[in-house]
Regions:
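Conserved acyl-donor/pantetheine-binding loop and adjacent beta-alpha core of acyl/acetyltransferases
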Residues: 71-112
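Conserved beta-hairpin
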Residues: 54-70, 85-86
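A short helix-loop-beta-strand connector motif used in the catalytic cores of GNAT acetyltransferases and
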Residues: 46-59, 75-82, 109
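Conserved N-terminal entry element of GNAT/NAT acetyltransferase domains
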Residues: 1-14, 18, 22-30
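Conserved GNAT acetyl-CoA-binding A-motif
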Residues: 107-110, 136-149
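Conserved active-site alpha-helix within GNAT-family acetyltransferase domains
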Residues: 126, 149-167
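Conserved acetyl-CoA-binding loop-helix of GNAT-fold acetyltransferases
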Residues: 112-115, 121-135, 160
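Conserved GNAT-fold acetyl-CoA-binding loop/helix
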Residues: 25-46
Length: 186
């Protein structure tokens, strides 16, 4: 049985980092990445711990072990992960429903979602996202993330729980097209 919870401490952070490493785009072959998805960012332990002290991320547990995670990344951490800094700068230029994101403290970035292979296609992604909403809808109006167009499984999953595409852009340095997706909780 899978239960949804918030990160409780450093052991959870270590288990998140393990799942992240195992499922990173450079750790899985192309066919697996295409069919099962992959993670893009590798967080350093110090930053991930700080993020979870401020706003604990959602985890899925089975028999006490973290089998999935949905990271909560408040805007205040925008400068802590260099690879994400361009994304935050770009988000500052966007509007949602005719309102600028820049200066609006009522949104956060869903930093990454990952489900252990043995728990995929069991509703864990959806369960974690719904727990995220239950946990933070009183403090935030929306969550935003970006998903590589080369990761169709992730795009489908995000759309299924309620994310909508708000912007698409090409990153020439990474030779990748990204979809910026938003889940408006209002």
């Amino acid at each position: 049985m899978v239960e949804y919870d918030l990160v409780r401490g450093e052991d959870d952070v270590a288990q998140i980092l393990d799942l992240q490493r195992i499922n990173h785009r450079y750790a899985v072959d192309a066919a697996t990445g295409q069919s099962q998805g992959y993670t893009t960012v590798q967080h350093d332990p110090e930053t991930l711990s700080a993020m979870n002290r401020r706003y604990p991320s959602v985890v899925a547990r089975s028999e006490g072990k973290v089998v999935g995670y949905c990271l909560m990344m408040a805007q205040e951490f925008r400068d802590r992960i260099p690879v994400l800094m361009p994304m935050f700068r770009m988000l500052d230029t966007l509007d949602w429903r005719e309102q600028p994101l820049a200066g609006n403290p009522r949104w956060f970035v869903m930093g990454q979602v990952c489900v252990a292979e043995a728990y995929r296609a069991m509703g864990v992604f959806d369960g974690m996202n719904h727990h995220l909403r239950e946990s933070y809808a009183d403090r935030f109006d929306m969550t935003i993330t970006e998903v590589s167009s080369a990761n169709p499984r992730s795009l489908r999953a995000h759309r299924r729980v309620g994310f909508e595409t708000m912007h698409v852009y090409e990153d020439p340095e990474a030779d990748e097209v990204w979809e910026v997706v938003i889940w408006d909780w209002r």
